């Protein structure tokens, strides 16, 4: 018997999306970003489906170690870098690359004793102003890294875009120009493009692209949908009806009596709530998919349940599946209705939701 709620992960969708991104950036290698438990899709699930990726990007050392323990041999890169000097021997032992973005990391690399050098990607702050060495610091930092015997040569170079998900915002051009001017003539790989860069800014593609959300079939751009680019949603979030009730006009439903029926109808109660990661602030009218049609959420989302208006003539039954988002109901649409982004929806599912390959 299938569990519910469950996140059904499509291996064929993941593979399709990788192929689409390869075609989009045919001269680049692909570093598939699988941080945050593979964007909620299951870290090892995703990595095992994407065996043809050239490498994987992660946020935490623990994620990289999990991939190595799971048999993944591809290049791994810690996108936030290491946090402690005691991390460095683990990078060496497990052949894990690291981003360097801060003075404190350089000091640790200069002071630690290692059995072999670490592969480093120096992050340049080209305009996002979150992580990275500034243009003013770059020459000095680069020289220190080149002089450090604990760092493998060549040093690779990277940056991150602030506004690439706004295709008409030319700040991305400004960032590309700053990065390219600063790093001109230096050896090593270059990586600039995230999902939005790969899809919308072909000049940013470089030696490696670092797609995240697009791998999961989701567009990084507000108002857009991954299917417009040939991407396929990789997650179907599914639960089921646990009650179907006749409901009279002018009667409320749920906590706070937030919603009142305008006419006689049939309500369905769905076994999913904010305890599973479905947002409590989903407003009235947020769609779910039941038996081939959209129906609206009514009343407040509670911890374990939400209620939908099935309609006066509904024939839906207890036990029928309910799709919260996925191939028939894009997560981008649900996120826009709720007032958030698809990234947040897919990554905030709680452990009560079974994640399984479909």
Swiss-Prot record:
NCBIfam families: alr (TIGR00492). It comes from Shewanella putrefaciens (strain CN-32 / ATCC BAA-453). Substrate binds at residues 130, 303. It catalyses: L-alanine = D-alanine. Keywords: Isomerase, Pyridoxal phosphate. The modification N6-(pyridoxal phosphate)lysine is found at residue 35. The keyword Cytoplasm does not apply. Signal peptide: none annotated. GO terms for biological process: D-alanine biosynthetic process. This is Alanine racemase. Its EC number is 5.1.1.1. The gene is alr. Belongs to the alanine racemase family.
